[in-house]
């Protein structure tokens, strides 16, 4: 029986493209190969689609393969990348010849795979699994395109996605329904840019009075804690810096820049021009456009010798900033999934233990910078309250299939929910798989659940949803056959742990091997934990949720 062709959409033009790329790779690895044929569809910086050659799926980051070093045109090889000294890297939008020409974009994509139109995608896949993040990925844009072409897709629909990307709209809806919301206000970019110092000082006083001198500043349309600042008893300069950062603006001061040595300046430029830690490229410096890190470095070197500051402004900026009260309490994240009938069920919430005040991009995606404790360590009755609250909010926003809802619970049990997301990070250590393991689902099984419930949601909500019934029937037949063949799989023991100083590495490697084998057509992995010492040891069958503990 023919497998279901699942196009995995990952990458994209947003600031969260690297999170998407890593998550898409996880889906590609872990999707059940008995049922599905995974098709990696890379979305580039300009929104073009590309059937990605499999070897590039395993690159560490997008910039490691795209844009490529060379392109081949009419039998000739020509250089694609400009001179990039000091180990600088750029995304494709920093190369003007590519950014300004559709033909060049296609030439570049030909080096890493096969460019596809949406019409070609329509004929190549049966279902779209969306691992995209941020703008154009979880804001209703790609969902609308797929609806137009009648391609069923994973997750929430257009309206819920559009609401899920806008933190200010979320807060407004929560306030209207009195749903677990803290105090907040908003500030438009146009108002901030046109304000003089007196007006900015008035906002500074207003927000300090409103929020008791402890508040959070965040962009309204960004995820992964990009552009977020936590302010505690700030002075006016710190306040202005935080607001500017949320709008992806930054002042570089000569007094600080000129004190640094060459290595420190190069490091600063790398951080400034990285979408994950800074403004990204292209950007404006005092109104002048810069596409390359080296050109920006040269400009700052020359200009800051004669003037006190340079103002940097990202092309990929923000239109609105959210200012909200700081909440004291335990931070958590909760995945809510729908059952076959669309009814929400909240998985055991995870407590986030971080080294600093902010669960920032690095803490979220780099190992060792935060710990996840599942379920959160509070009174069991409060865990029930959290799960019920998350389900309530899920229904209020009209989410479908699954969502990730973050929040805080105070010392007296009051719950605040913020940043409801219509998608979740899908890397191996993410909340998405961490919490699924608590109810006995490995990544392969959980992805299958998301697929089936997404297909049912599209049947229910798409104007021509009945056309997807045959795909659902085919999928159900495939899974019935797969269950019948499961006893024929070769059982493979994956032994991890041990008693050496590297046992934590063994656990991580063992998890990765277990997860990849779980999606295999031929093998059934069995997780085994080894304990003891050099004189004696014991072997334990490791429960799935224990294997995913930090």
State where each predicted segment sits:
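Phosphate-binding site of ATP-dependent enzymes
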Residues: 237-373, 377, 414-416
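Conserved metal-phosphate-binding beta-hairpin within the catalytic cores
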Residues: 146, 324-325, 334, 394-427, ...
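ATP-binding N-terminal substructure of ATP-dependent carboxylate-amine bond-forming enzymes
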Residues: 1-176, 187-202, 449, 453-550
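Rossmann-like NAD(P)H-binding beta-loop-alpha module
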Residues: 176-225, 229
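Active-site "cap" helix and flanking loop/linker of ATP-utilizing ligase/carboxylase catalytic domains
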Residues: 350-403, 431-475
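Short beta-strand-to-turn element immediately C-terminal to the catalytic PLP-Schiff-base lysine
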Residues: 187, 228-234, 336-339, 410, ...
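Internal, charge-rich low-complexity segments
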Residues: 50-80, 226, 230-288, 535-550
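Short acidic-glycine loop/turn motifs at beta-strand connectors
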Residues: 44-46, 233, 338-343, 410-413, ...
């Amino acid at each position: 029986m023919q497998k279901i062709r699942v196009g995995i959409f990952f990458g994209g033009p947003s600031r969260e493209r690297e999170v998407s790329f890593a998550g898409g790779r996880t889906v590609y690895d872990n999707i059940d190969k008995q049922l599905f044929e995974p098709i990696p569809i890379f979305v580039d910086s300009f929104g073009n689609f590309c059937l990605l050659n499999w070897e590039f799926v395993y690159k560490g980051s997008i910039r490691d393969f795209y844009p490529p070093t060379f392109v081949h045109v009419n039998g000739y090889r020509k250089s694609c990348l400009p001179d990039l000294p000091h180990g600088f890297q750029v995304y494709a939008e920093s190369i003007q010849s590519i950014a300004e020409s559709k033909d060049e974009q296609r030439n570049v994509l030909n080096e890493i795979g096969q460019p596809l139109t949406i019409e070609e995608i329509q004929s190549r896949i049966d279902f779209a699994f969306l691992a995209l993040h941020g703008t154009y990925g979880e804001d209703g844009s790609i969902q609308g395109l797929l609806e137009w072409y009648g391609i069923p897709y994973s997750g929430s629909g257009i309206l819920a996605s559009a609401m899920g990307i806008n933190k200010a709209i979320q807060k407004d809806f929560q306030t209207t329904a009195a749903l677990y919301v803290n105090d907040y206000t908003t500030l438009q970019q146009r108002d901030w840019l046109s304000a003089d110092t007196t007006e900015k000082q008035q906002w500074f006083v207003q927000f300090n009075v409103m929020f008791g001198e402890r508040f959070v500043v965040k962009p309204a349309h960004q995820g992964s804690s990009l552009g977020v600042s936590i302010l505690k008893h700030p002075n006016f300069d710190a306040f202005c810096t935080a607001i500017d950062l949320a709008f992806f603006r930054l002042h570089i001061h000569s007094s600080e820049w000129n004190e640094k040595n060459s290595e420190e300046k190069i490091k600063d430029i790398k951080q400034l021009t990285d979408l994950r830690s800074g403004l990204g490229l292209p950007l404006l410096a005092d109104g002048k456009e810069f596409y390359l890190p080296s050109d920006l470095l040269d400009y700052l070197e020359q200009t800051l010798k004669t003037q006190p500051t340079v103002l940097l402004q990202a092309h990929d900026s923000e239109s609105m900033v959210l200012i909200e009260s700081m909440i004291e309490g335990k931070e958590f994240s909760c995945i809510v999934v729908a059952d076959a009938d669309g009814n929400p069920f909240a998985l055991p919430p995870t407590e986030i233990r971080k080294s600093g005040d902010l669960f920032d991009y690095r803490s979220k995606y780099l190992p060792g910078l935060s710990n996840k404790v599942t379920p959160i360590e509070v009174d069991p009755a409060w865990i029930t309250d959290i799960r019920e609250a998350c389900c309530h909010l899920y229904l209020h926003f009209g989410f479908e299939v699954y969502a990730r809802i973050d929040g805080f619970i105070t010392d007296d049990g009051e719950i605040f929910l913020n940043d409801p997301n219509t998608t979740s990070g899908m890397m191996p250590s993410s909340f998405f798989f961490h919490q699924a393991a608590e109810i006995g689902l490995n990544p392969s099984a959980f992805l299958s659940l998301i697929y089936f419930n997404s297909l049912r949601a599209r049947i229910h909500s798409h104007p021509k949803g009945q056309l997807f019934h045959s795909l659902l029937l085919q999928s159900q037949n495939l899974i019935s056959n797969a269950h019948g063949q499961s006893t024929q799989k070769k059982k493979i023991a994956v032994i991890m742990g041990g008693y050496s100083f590297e046992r934590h590495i063994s656990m991580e490697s063992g998890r990765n091997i277990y997860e990849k084998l779980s999606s295999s057509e031929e093998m059934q992995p069995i997780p085994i934990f080894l304990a003891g010492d050099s004189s004696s040891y014991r072997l334990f069958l490791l429960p799935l949720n224990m294997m995913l503990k930090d």
